[in-house]
Amino acid sequence: MPCAQRSWLANLSVVAQLLNFGALCYGRQPQPGPVRFPDRRQEHFIKGLPEYHVVGPVRVDASGHFLSYGLHYPITSSRRKRDLDGSEDWVYYRISHEEKDLFFNLTVNQGFLSNSYIMEKRYGNLSHVKMMASSAPLCHLSGTVLQQGTRVGTAALSACHGLTGFFQLPHGDFFIEPVKKHPLVEGGYHPHIVYRRQKVPETKEPTCGLKDSVNISQKQELWREKWERHNLPSRSLSRRSISKERWVETLVVADTKMIEYHGSENVESYILTIMNMVTGLFHNPSIGNAIHIVVVRLILLEEEEQGLKIVHHAEKTLSSFCKWQKSINPKSDLNPVHHDVAVLLTRKDICAGFNRPCETLGLSHLSGMCQPHRSCNINEDSGLPLAFTIAHELGHSFGIQHDGKENDCEPVGRHPYIMSRQLQYDPTPLTWSKCSEEYITRFLDRGWGFCLDDIPKKKGLKSKVIAPGVIYDVHHQCQLQYGPNATFCQEVENVCQTLWCSVKGFCRSKLDAAADGTQCGEKKWCMAGKCITVGKKPESIPGGWGRWSPWSHCSRTCGAGVQSAERLCNNPEPKFGGKYCTGERKRYRLCNVHPCRSEAPTFRQMQCSEFDTVPYKNELYHWFPIFNPAHPCELYCRPIDGQFSEKMLDAVIDGTPCFEGGNSRNVCINGICKMVGCDYEIDSNATEDRCGVCLGDGSSCQTVRKMFKQKEGSGYVDIGLIPKGARDIRVMEIEGAGNFLAIRSEDPEKYYLNGGFIIQWNGNYKLAGTVFQYDRKGDLEKLMATGPTNESVWIQLLFQVTNPGIKYEYTIQKDGLDNDVEQQMYFWQYGHWTECSVTCGTGIRRQTAHCIKKGRGMVKATFCDPETQPNGRQKKCHEKACPPRWWAGEWEACSATCGPHGEKKRTVLCIQTMVSDEQALPPTDCQHLLKPKTLLSCNRDILCPSDWTVGNWSECSVSCGGGVRIRSVTCAKNHDEPCDVTRKPNSRALCGLQQCPSSRRVLKPNKGTISNGKNPPTLKPVPPPTSRPRMLTTPTGPESMSTSTPAISSPSPTTASKEGDLGGKQWQDSSTQPELSSRYLISTGSTSQPILTSQSLSIQPSEENVSSSDTGPTSEGGLVATTTSGSGLSSSRNPITWPVTPFYNTLTKGPEMEIHSGSGEEREQPEDKDESNPVIWTKIRVPGNDAPVESTEMPLAPPLTPDLSRESWWPPFSTVMEGLLPSQRPTTSETGTPRVEGMVTEKPANTLLPLGGDHQPEPSGKTANRNHLKLPNNMNQTKSSEPVLTEEDATSLITEGFLLNASNYKQLTNGHGSAHWIVGNWSECSTTCGLGAYWRRVECSTQMDSDCAAIQRPDPAKRCHLRPCAGWKVGNWSKCSRNCSGGFKIREIQCVDSRDHRNLRPFHCQFLAGIPPPLSMSCNPEPCEAWQVEPWSQCSRSCGGGVQERGVFCPGGLCDWTKRPTSTMSCNEHLCCHWATGNWDLCSTSCGGGFQKRTVQCVPSEGNKTEDQDQCLCDHKPRPPEFKKCNQQACKKSADLLCTKDKLSASFCQTLKAMKKCSVPTVRAECCFSCPQTHITHTQRQRRQRLLQKSKEL
């Protein structure tokens, strides 16, 4: 299928369409050839279609540009809320179908699935059921389809696994589905099948099983009205016709045959795809109502369901299904899974009225919507057309009758509708008829769609797996088991273990437990036979934002850095499931936007250089950045001398430009590329106008558009100059050609693109301060750059073929415009000194000027005049002395390019920076640092190539004048590697370059015979020389003969008009090419002239030797042309036209040449300056003449009309590498005697050339030189007034370089003429590739160069440009991927110029012999050995995480390093704990045996957290004692020891005693009287009291 231009996508200009043509066609269609169908069932179906198309859909953006071959719509997050006002995500696809593009504009069908959608798998009954809140992806789409040249159609597609669904176009309905089981290729298309709806193979037209009868339809309505009155008596109906949205909550059931056919894992996706299509059909405006089909529940019958019988008999199946679906439908419409209609999908071949297969596709109750026992239908699965069947049967549920039966909607012209009884497969799209609209509107207006008014509610289910008891309460479970009259037995307890139901007053049970989720009490439900409490969560607290933090430091000192401020969600923090704060968390602004110095390193380069001091794989490198377009805000760096790159940072520092070069101001912030406007505001839409003025209106801009029309040229030709400051540069060819665009600077020797005859790759090239995008699609080239350029550049064209035209344009600011900004309001002012540039040694502090606004402060630098910005200041700063460090020099070249002994060295010194110098120190001063390596192995993984062997040189092909010698060159294969082709010796060489002797300067003529026209001539190829002069000759003959010159002219030379007749065919000169109008006239003055007739000349090569005539002025090797005449051959005195086809040349077009005979009129002819057309000489022989006469190759100019048919007087001439010879035209004279005349040459003198009557005016603006042509002195002349060609004329012709082959030239004079230069043949190019030279012999005709000094000497040499000397450059092999058991290693292969080592495009190497060097090779094939391990050592620590070690070694060094056993293992990871003891308490008694107590705890050791104390175990050490004895001595009996008074106050001691603190030893000691010792007897206490009483009395 052709790739058509999508001009209908947007209002693109022709230029923009050309630029984007390649992108729009990318990934357009599958490759030609048959498509395999791995799935047999699909193959059988497709092969049965009369017509189908294989397409390759691609995902595109809104503009139609290619994005991906991946078609899946990637919404992986949890399903969003589907409110009607929510935002929608759009997705776009493009398909090339029937030579036109289809552009799909789709969005997720938000209302297609209910928010409480449930997928349920049933295994026979309710006790074996699995319910899940399905996680079906949001891949079901709906929208529009746009076809080129037509209006918009509708589409409903599912992008879950490819594109499946249907779309409507004005000329028909189409289905699309992917080729199943087709292998998915990364980066490749997935083939899809598109077929028309009417092309679905069916033996007969399928029908609907609903019977068409007036009586039946009337009875259905009466039954419905009766049911409405009986079941809904209190509902008042509004008789107004109000259009409002309706939601049809739908249950879809798939039987076991559906699951078996589509597979358990695919059936859900297939059904949802079908229902998505059904939704699209009900959204067709022809239905006249807003109806939404919403799937709330999908039931997959994994096993045959009890109570549901699906048979061939459609009515019985429908009756069984309706009864069954009512039993499982929750009664309350508020239940999230309550359905309004049930749809059964089956693979059973159903038939209306019979229990056998037939053509019935579906059956439904008429007007059954919202009736629980009749709102149901059955549908036979027939593939994607199933969607139309379901829509048809749902229409019956809305009371829609068949079209054409008892109504006026009979399909006109067999144009069907959705509600046609027989689903005829007509190409036009299916819609709802006017009758269908009236039926459904009447149904809804009567209030029969009352159940469709509620919007599907979202149910608060938290778990993905839903317990059945949540949906079915205990009463419903009993009804499912024992019928609709059963209820739950309230008297029975422990419902979670056994469900008891009341049936006819008796409690019965099947000893089954109630379903999980059944309510078993307040805030409790059944789970796994147990009643579990459902906890209530506290009220949630939503979060609130706190205050903004101050602005951070600027990330850069110049070039637009970034500052940030952030706020936290802590006012208050969200708790108990409360929503987190929404809105802006962190804000950014740009700072220090003034540009950095041009010589300063880029910001990315500075970040890469930070890793110069960080060892990478134990080596230090100097890193520089590389750009990854796919991840512009990640930092990738590459060593300067390395061939690998590494991602150093996941996110560059804020303020790093996203793209280096160009005019993009976008910067990376927090790892994301942010758009920055020209006003340096983040996410700003401020842009520059066409000439760079921020927020400008373009009034200061001018766009220059030019066209380069030069058709022909050689080498590099200037197209035009792009001035400095140019923007929006576009250069493009009008049509594809074989030419190449090039760019060079104003320096002629400096090329930026495609210079030196080297064609570069497509891509972006940084030059002149901007980036030029060079793109070549086929032969069409274009250049684009945003600008501005910082220097003027020349656009050139490297000519290869005719230029069809090149147009280019650019935008530049007008000259002489004043700046509207008031300059006096803004001025430059120096800022603060920066910190020292170094942390040690001597550095620099800088001070820069900032743009200041008067009365405001520092503003952006763009407000100040950059021309007046003062230079920055700097001064030295001295810091502490720098410490010693290692300095490593550059690596020397490797000692070997291959083999096992390669090494490279470098110098490593210990140095210290002292001011501006480096001082070398002893190595011991740096011994604390890691010393870089001084010796490194290299090229050891590269096998050395085999050696070339050469043979002896052959003899030279010629002895002089330039020849070739050859020799054999073979590869010895003395190594495993092949020979290096880049070092292959030459097998050919030039030889015999010495000049040939003068006696052989004239070559021997070719041999030839003349035939009488029976055999066509075989033309000898004549190589076209680089310089193609014109040469004019006339036949020469013996001196005694009166000669005449045959005329070669345009047809009808006697008329002066531009029209003529060629053998009965009309011709007309083209006035649009004036360069074709000039002619040459060569004639003699004889009155009796032999004429070349149209039937007389034929040329036939022969192997006979030809010698020159004794009577003619010829010599060996001379070239003579003859004219003969004989009896029986007619002749004419009128000039005869000889049309000639020019030699093929794409550069110039030469003039027409005429040679007239007879006494014709004098004709002037304008001189033609063009010398590019070739003139070929031929050699002929006249039969019937004893003296063999040689002929000369005659130079011929192109005819007036370049393409003459075979019916013309003369056949066309060969154009490519062939001599220009007319065929099968014998030439004779009246006398039969050959006439030989001298050579005629053209001299650019001031003498005039006669002009014929049919002269074509010469181009305007040119003054032609008139050439006076004379015959040589040795020729007989007549008394004609026409001039003759002189010897001087012939010399002039040779001098001007018009002679094609001087060696074939026979000197016309007898030695009395003037001297002239004679040139030899051009040699072959001196080289087989690259720049070389052609050589030829140049000598004076007198053999004395001084005689020809007055004449300009022709060039003896000229340059020749052949293809570049291309060769394959191979990089170093990488390390082997495995060290044993077979790995691989890779290397880089590049096509390079073997002379200057520049990279070439790969096609330059396609002519090299042999295949390219391999990119990869196997390595280390030896089998891996087993690792040897030693026993584990003891743990290094007894607690707190120790390490065990063991020896792991490989005996032979050939073990798999990826499977190396661990040599270390953690051990004793428990916490280190110890027993901690407190201080001993006081002894419980002062005598008589007491005890002391202290605290003993197991606590973590030092360094562990105190909260880890619960995890401590101290069993490994004995527990310290917690008690000990004290004061074991016996108490003394002395009365002095008796306590008679408390040491503290009596009242305080009584208080302590009341608080029961007497047991405390310190309290007992201070209050000894109030708290006596326990061992004091009663008598002692009495005696103590008496003593105390006495003391008081005293």
From Swiss-Prot:
Induction: By IFN-alpha and by IL1B/interleukin-1 beta. Up-regulated in articular cartilage and synovium from arthritis patients. Up-regulared in chondrocytes.
Biased composition (Polar residues): 1067-1076, 1095-1114, 1273-1283
Domain TSP type-1, chain residue ranges per copy: 542-597, 823-883, 887-943, 944-997, 1313-1366, 1368-1422, 1423-1471, 1472-1532
Signal peptide: 1-25
pH effects: Optimum pH is between 7.5 and 9.5 with COMP for substrate.
Chain positions covered by the region annotation Spacer 2: 997-1316
Classification via Pfam families: ADAMTS_CR_2 (PF17771), ADAMTS_CR_3 (PF19236), ADAMTS_spacer1 (PF05986), Pep_M12B_propep (PF01562), Reprolysin (PF01421), TSP1_ADAMTS (PF19030), TSP_1 (PF00090)
SMART domains named among the record's database cross-references: TSP1
Cofactor, how bound (note): Binds 1 zinc ion per subunit.
Annotated glycan sites: 105, 125, 215, 485, 685, 790, 952, 1105, 1276, 1301, 1321, 1372, 1379, 1504
Residue ranges of the region described as Spacer 1: 701-827
Name this polypeptide is given: A disintegrin and metalloproteinase with thrombospondin motifs 12
Annotated Zn(2+) binding sites: 208, 392, 396, 402
Domain Peptidase M12B: residue ranges: 246-456
PROSITE patterns, per the entry: ADAM_MEPRO, PLAC, TSP1, ZINC_PROTEASE
Gene name of the encoded protein: ADAMTS12
Positions of the pro-segment in this chain: 26-240
EC number: 3.4.24.-
Enzyme class: hydrolase
Keyword Ribosomal protein among record annotations: no
